[in-house]
């Protein structure tokens, strides 16, 4: 009984839905900054840096600059694509995509999340140097890094669930094929 409950949680499609919404606060925050908001910025230097980010983009890619001028931060767009990837792991249209692509990508996300998590712990312990942390409210780190961590873990779990569902579906399809072959074989023997 306990194993069935664990399997339901472990193999739930809910992981993909949680992953899909985990990056939306990040996408909203980055979009707010692209629209000129200073929410979460605590120093004038960082405010000027965010405000001047569009000018920095103007010197580089015209595509990224155009997106930014209409209020679309490229990383926010990537967050939305990452959410769509998570949804693909739990919906019927995702099952039409190449399985290997979703499974390899999902496993890579899981491994990468574990590595980054260890590196973050090492930074907090002082084993690795910390990056520049001035100028942003602490909740900004929770929204950005917390969302990325949650996304990584839940995408990994959604991948395991997807892998299990596809394996079960393949077994059912193989049984159906064997059943049809048996019927055809019996029909062939009967008509001989």
Language-model segments: residues:
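Cytoplasmic juxtamembrane regions at transmembrane-helix boundaries
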Residues: 2-12, 84-108, 166-187
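Transmembrane alpha-helical segments in integral membrane proteins
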Residues: 20-23, 71-92, 150-168
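Perimembrane loop-to-helix junctions flanking transmembrane segments
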Residues: 42-63
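Hydrophobic alpha-helical transmembrane segments
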Residues: 57-80, 139-153
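Membrane-helix interface motif
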Residues: 32-49, 118-129
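Membrane-interface helix-boundary signature
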Residues: 5-19, 61-68, 95-105, 134-144
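N-terminal signal-anchor transmembrane alpha helix
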Residues: 17-36
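Alpha-helical transmembrane segments of multi-pass integral membrane proteins
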Residues: 112-192
């Amino acid at each position: 009984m306990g194993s069935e409950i664990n399997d339901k949680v472990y193999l739930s499609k809910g992981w993909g839905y949680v992953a899909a919404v985990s990056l939306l606060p990040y996408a909203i925050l980055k979009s707010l900054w692209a629209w000129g908001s200073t929410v979460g910025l605590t120093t004038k230097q960082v405010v000027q840096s965010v405000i001047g980010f569009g000018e920095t983009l103007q010197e580089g890619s015209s595509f990224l600059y155009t997106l930014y001028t209409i209020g679309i931060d490229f990383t926010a767009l990537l967050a939305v694509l990452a959410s769509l990837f998570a949804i693909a792991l739990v919906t019927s249209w995702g099952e039409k995509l190449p399985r290997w692509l979703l499974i390899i990508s999902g496993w890579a996300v899981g491994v990468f999340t574990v590595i980054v998590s260890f590196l973050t712990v090492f930074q907090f312990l002082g084993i690795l140097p910390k990056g520049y942390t001035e100028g942003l409210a602490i909740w900004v780190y929770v929204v950005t890094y917390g969302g990325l961590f949650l996304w990584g873990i839940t995408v990994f779990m959604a991948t395991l669930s997807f892998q299990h569902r596809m394996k079960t579906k393949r077994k059912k399809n193989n049984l159906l094929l064997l059943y049809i072959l048996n019927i055809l074989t019996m029909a062939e023997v009967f008509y001989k």
